[in-house]
Swiss-Prot record:
Required for maturation of 30S ribosomal subunits. Transmembrane segments: none annotated. Gene3D superfamilies: Ribosome maturation factor RimP, C-terminal domain, RimP-like superfamily, N-terminal. GO terms for biological process: ribosomal small subunit assembly; translation. Its main location: cytoplasm. The keyword ATP-binding does not apply. This is Ribosome maturation factor RimP. It is found in: Cytoplasm. GO terms for cellular component: cytosol. Belongs to the RimP family. It comes from Halothermothrix orenii (strain H 168 / OCM 544 / DSM 9562). Keywords: Cytoplasm, Ribosome biogenesis.
């Protein structure tokens, strides 16, 4: 499935950028009997609006029909990444420094393959994280990150 998502990313990137938005992620999954192509976009200037999603969806749908990288039928969904936004690029760890994140690694880092902690930025190709459970700072090679996303920090919600 990686080839499909890579191809869709290549098609979606210029469409998303032409609207002043950023492409966060592309997923192609099976849900029940349906195949779903999800494209997550972000507005660096603020919120992603319904108009943003509609415009990207319309333009991307036209491009997908033209190029036809997916042979089977599917549902196209375009949305914001939500509160638990995936962290896919090294720059995401700079941008979201100070935020709580979940990180799963390919191999154990200091005995852990699953780490929850505060992002402290990065040092070159290493992501710095302050573990939530013991306040120990870890450096995780970016190449070892299998999956990462922001988390809601319920301990620091004020209201």
């Amino acid at each position: 499935m990686g080839k499909i998502t890579d191809r869709v990313e290549d098609l979606a990137q210029p469409i998303v950028e032409s609207q002043g938005l950023e492409l966060v992620d592309v997923e192609y999954v099976k849900e029940g009997e349906n195949r779903v192509l999800r494209v997550f976009i972000e507005n660096p200037e603020g919120e992603v609006t319904l108009d943003h999603c509609e415009n990207v969806s319309k333009n991307l749908d036209e491009k997908l029909d033209e190029v036809d990288p997916i042979q089977e039928s599917y549902i196209l969904e375009v949305s914001s990444p939500g509160i638990e936004r995936p962290l896919k690029k090294k720059e995401d760890f700079d941008r979201f420094s100070g935020k709580l994140a979940y990180i799963k690694t390919f191999a154990p880092v200091s005995g852990n393959k699953e780490i929850t902690g505060i992002i402290k930025g990065r040092d070159g190709d290493n992501i710095k994280v302050l573990k939530k459970d013991d306040d120990k700072e870890l450096e995780i090679p970016f190449s070892q990150i299998a999956k990462a996303h922001l988390m809601v920090d319920f301990d620091n919600i004020t209201g």
